[in-house]
Each structure stands twice: as structure tokens, then as C-alpha cells.
């Protein structure tokens, strides 16, 4: 069942209910604090939902235009830590489903905190039934209706977190000296192309942008990848005394 925005009114009602409880039983100060905190939660939740929806729509549009290549580019451009939490349902197949499920359950746990508050504070009347029903409806909307139909892949989140390490293991920042299109300059972390001014270190053969490695070598005498000495040591100064005088050509 796909009801992507139905959780927003339930979330707003739950937060308004918590603010009203604080006002009725603890006064204006508690209501002000609860209302401000509830507003922050709701705004952040709306932003997260909008971000996920935007990423999913953009990935779907790029996949239609580029035959699937655009989705991979968006996945590489997105921060690896945010992908498991904010990626949309249509942005990455099984990984996107796992991300959607993870995000929904995280928000559900947050709002489940209000359920004990309602049970403890409310008096025995019909109001507690209404409040408890609202909280349960919010949790059901977020956990059941918004969960993906397919089973979540438990390895997708870990794979997203380890994307940077995988890139380093595959040698994407090695600069092997062949000028491959996927090589990256380990100084500025940008891609390298043959049309750019590149420089190979003589001893190890690692390749970098000429400008980047020039600035690096002014402060460090070693290769930023393998730490091999790239700059020859300075020539020894002439010894003091007679040898220094002999080195001077007489006028």
C-alpha cells in the first residue's frame, strides 16, 4: 500500500497532542518547551521526507534518460553516511527499500516515546482512548504502510557506509601512472583526465595534478600515496675551514 504523505498529518496531530498535554497539566512554560521541540521535530521530519522524495524522483528521471547510469552517478555523489537513512524508494532497488524501512522505523521509535506519556498523564476518560488511537495510527502508518514490499537487504546499509573504504581498496586513488579515467588525484580528491596537466613522480610512478603535487612537495618530500621519497635530499654544504676556502675561486 503506497501512501507516501499520509504520515505527515498523523505526525502533526501527535505533536500537537503532546503540546496540549503539557499545557493542561504542567503550565505555559512546559507547553512552550514542548511546542518548540515538537516544531523542530516536525520540520526536520518534513525535510527528510522531502529530501527522500526529491532523490527518488531525480534518480528515476536520470535512469529514464541515461539508461540507469544517472542513478549510479547520484549514488556516488551523495554522502555515503546519508544514503542508508535518506535515500528514496526508487533510487536504488533493494538498497533503497532497506533505506526507506530503516528511516521509517527510526522515526517510529521517536514518536513511540509519546505513547507512555499519554498513558501516564491522561485521566481515565475518553480522551486517553483518542490520544492512544492517534499515536498507534501514526506508528502503523510509518511502519506498515510506508515499508517496502520487498524484504530489506541487511548488507546494503553496511555497504553504503564502507563505500569510501571500498574505493580505496579498488585503487581509485592510487594514480598508477596510466592515466585511467577513473583515477583520482589523492591531493585534491578530484578526477584526473589526460587533457589536464598531470605529473608522474619519478620513483614510484604515481600520478597527480601537476599543480596539486607541486604544492604538496613544497611541504612534504614524500609521495602522498606510498610515502616514497620524491624529492632528492639537499646537497651537503661545504665544510668550514680550509676546504671551504679552497672551493672559492681566487680573484
From Swiss-Prot:
<keyword id="KW-0472">Membrane</keyword>
<protein>
    <recommendedName>
        <fullName>E3 ubiquitin-protein ligase Os06g0535400</fullName>
        <ecNumber>2.3.2.27</ecNumber>
    </recommendedName>
</protein>
<keyword id="KW-0808">Transferase</keyword>
<dbReference type="Pfam" id="PF13639">
    <property type="entry name" value="zf-RING_2"/>
</dbReference>
<keyword id="KW-0833">Ubl conjugation pathway</keyword>
<keyword id="KW-0479">Metal-binding</keyword>
<dbReference type="GO" id="GO:0004842">
    <property type="term" value="F:ubiquitin-protein transferase activity"/>
</dbReference>
<comment type="function">
    <text>Possesses E3 ubiquitin-protein ligase in vitro.</text>
</comment>
<dbReference type="InterPro" id="IPR001841">
    <property type="entry name" value="Znf_RING"/>
</dbReference>
<feature type="transmembrane region" description="Helical">
    <location>
        <begin position="127"/>
        <end position="147"/>
    </location>
</feature>
<dbReference type="GO" id="GO:0016020">
    <property type="term" value="C:membrane"/>
</dbReference>
<keyword id="KW-0863">Zinc-finger</keyword>
<feature type="transmembrane region" description="Helical">
    <location>
        <begin position="28"/>
        <end position="48"/>
    </location>
</feature>
<comment type="pathway">
    <text>Protein modification; protein ubiquitination.</text>
</comment>
<keyword id="KW-0812">Transmembrane</keyword>
<keyword id="KW-0862">Zinc</keyword>
<keyword id="KW-1133">Transmembrane helix</keyword>
<dbReference type="GO" id="GO:0008270">
    <property type="term" value="F:zinc ion binding"/>
</dbReference>
<dbReference type="InterPro" id="IPR013083">
    <property type="entry name" value="Znf_RING/FYVE/PHD"/>
</dbReference>
<dbReference type="GO" id="GO:0016567">
    <property type="term" value="P:protein ubiquitination"/>
</dbReference>
<feature type="zinc finger region" description="RING-type; atypical">
    <location>
        <begin position="185"/>
        <end position="227"/>
    </location>
</feature>
<feature type="transmembrane region" description="Helical">
    <location>
        <begin position="102"/>
        <end position="122"/>
    </location>
</feature>
